[in-house]
């Protein structure tokens, strides 16, 4: 019984360390970025967004859409693969793409004030 508890504790401790440890290579994308989302389908326009990356996590540093502040969230993998979510009031968009050391690009889709929109995004390190 004690052996099972000790084994379970060791497994949980190791899992917590693995989950919380951020690989050093993900830090190569850390910093501030200037992002632009361009609509290619629908009526959402061109949207400039301030973006930051810390430890592989994406967050917003500025920008608005339809009079709402934009909140960004998402991840950048060690290889530069990006998945992100943007929320501006009741509007939500999801995007995917890829980062290199100084720029990134991808696609997005979501809902604007007048219906569904989709397009491309690009980002450069500030």
Residue ranges and their predicted role:
Residues 19-26:
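Sec/Tat signal peptide C-region and signal peptidase I cleavage site
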Residues 1-10:
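Bacterial N-terminal signal peptides that target proteins for export
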Residues 9-18:
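Bacterial N-terminal signal peptides
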């Amino acid at each position: 019984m004690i052996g099972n508890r000790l084994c379970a504790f060791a497994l949980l401790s190791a899992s917590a360390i693995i989950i919380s440890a951020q690989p050093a290579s993900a830090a190569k994308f850390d910093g501030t970025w200037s992002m632009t989302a361009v609509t290619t389908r629908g009526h959402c326009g061109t949207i400039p967004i301030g973006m930051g990356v810390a430890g592989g996590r994406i967050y917003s540093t500025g920008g608005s859409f339809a009079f709402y502040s934009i909140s960004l969230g998402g991840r950048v993998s060690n290889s530069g693969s990006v998945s992100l979510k943007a929320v501006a009031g009741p509007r939500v968009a999801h995007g995917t793409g890829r980062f290199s050391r100084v720029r990134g690009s991808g696609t997005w889709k979501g809902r604007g004030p007048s219906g569904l929109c989709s397009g491309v995004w690009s980002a450069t390190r500030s």
